[in-house]
Curated annotation (Swiss-Prot):
Gene Ontology BP annotations: glycolytic process
Keyword Signal attached: no
Reaction equations catalysed: D-glucose + ATP = D-glucose 6-phosphate + ADP + H(+)
GO molecular function: ATP binding; D-glucose binding; glucokinase activity
Name assigned to this protein: Probable glucokinase 2
Kinase is among the record's keywords: yes
Family per record: Belongs to the bacterial glucokinase family.
SUPFAM superfamilies per UniProt: Actin-like ATPase domain
Alphabetized Gene3D superfamilies for the sequence: 3.30.420.40, 3.40.367.20
EC number: 2.7.1.2
Length: 377
């Protein structure tokens, strides 16, 4: 549960003439729990981040938010939430989502807007966002605040000219976490504000290289290993099957077995530990994390070219944690990204990697909460 001492900070904010305290709520739901930002409706620069609370099913999430609602009432019973947004993993249909980064039967991870406490998630003033949709709105918010560029480094500058992270036309925003997310940001003179299009393109099936490619044999064996685990060896895996927190342990299992003959139980392999071992130079882990990123760049290439993007943004916390490794293998990533059947399509396509921590999902949910709050009745 969240600390009431943090919630008390909202009493420092401006109230309305009738004494009401107008606020906005941004919430980001991850695989292990949720983060919440409460901000002043009158000034979005005045906010309190409540940190992390554990939740791995619908009941736990609703209990945490109901407890938060009671704590806000206890601190100031005249508060009114004018806009709320909550970021979730999984397709959203008719105000309902089955969260894909939680374990268990669909019934225990199905969430509707009606399930949420209505005082902090009011009807008609609350919205679900796909997690990468929220991240993309966070990129827009960071650009508006002039804090976007400082958190990214442009890769492959010998292949593309310098330019803004958020392109003037189309930008693909990608992130590897418990899954692989992708969203499109479109800026056009036809619209006053940038448009975000959430996608499920992390679930596109992998495009394998052919027989004459130098990496064909090893790549084919790795893809088959992943297919054996998920699809009885019959179907081509999706990019998320390797470019995710569940995919990295499978890659490590493959390379460790190839080197030692030992088949480690995949449930005993922790993705974070594999990444740390790779940073320390352990060969099996280096091979696994490198493959993890090679396929990530292949997914980025497919997404950015298919959507005619000028910029491709690799974002969120894992990208920051693995930044030294990314920079170390940059030449191999560059070769992968620009190796394409239509090389002229790659001209000028910029790639950015996040290098410092900034919670784009919280920024994005807060951005949308204020957009809802300021929307005319």
């Amino acid at each position: 549960m969240f600390d009431i001492e943090l919630v008390k900070k909202i009493n420092d904010w401006k109230v309305s003439e009738d004494g009401a305290l107008p606020i906005c709520i941004g919430c980001d739901v991850g695989g292990s729990g949720l983060r919440v930002r409460i901000s002043s409706f009158n000034d979005s620069e005045k906010y309190v981040d409540l940190g992390h609370a554990k939740a791995k099913c619908t009941k736990q999430l609703v209990d945490v938010l109901a407890d938060l609602e009671q704590k806000i009432k206890q601190v100031n019973d005249k508060f009114v939430c004018l806009g709320a947004a909550i970021a979730v993993a999984g397709p959203i249909k008719a105000g309902t989502v089955i969260l894909t980064n939680w374990q268990g039967e669909p019934a225990v991870r199905t969430l509707t807007l009606k399930d949420l406490p209505q005082k902090i998630f009011p009807k008609d003033r609350s919205v679900f966002l796909n997690d990468l949709e929220a991240g993309a709105y966070g990129v827009i918010a960071a650009a508006d605040k002039d804090i976007l560029e400082q958190n990214f480094v442009q890769l492959f500058q010998d292949k593309a000219p310098k330019g803004p992270v958020l392109a003037n036309g189309r930008t693909a925003v990608l992130a590897m976490g418990s899954g692989l997310g992708a969203a499109l940001v479109v800026r056009t003179p036809l619209l006053k504000n940038p448009l975000v299009l959430p996608t499920e393109l992390g679930h596109v099936q992998i495009a394998p290289n052919m027989k004459e490619h130098k990496n064909f044999k090893q790549e084919r064996e790795l893809i088959q290993h992943i297919s054996n685990h998920y699809y009885k060896g019959e179907l081509d895996p999706e990019y998320e099957d390797i470019c995710s927190g569940r995919g990295l342990p499978l890659a490590y299992q493959f390379y460790h077995q190839k080197k030692t003959g030992e088949l480690l139980p995949v449930e005993q392999i922790d993705a974070g530990e594999v990444a740390k071992k790779a940073m320390d130079g352990e060969e099996d882990a280096v091979d696994a994390l490198k493959a993890h990123y090679i396929f990530y760049l292949r997914a980025a290439k497919a997404i950015a070219t298919s959507l005619s993007c000028e910029s491709c943004v690799l974002s969120l916390d894992n990208q920051v944690k693995n930044h030294p490794f990314v920079m170390k293998i940059m030449k191999e990533l560059e070769d992968e990204f620009y190796e394409f059947i239509r090389p002229d399509w790659m001209n000028g396509l910029r790639v950015y990697s996040q290098k410092s921590i900034l919670n784009f999902n919280i920024l994005g949910t807060d951005y949308m909460a204020h957009a809802i709050a300021n929307k005319p009745e």
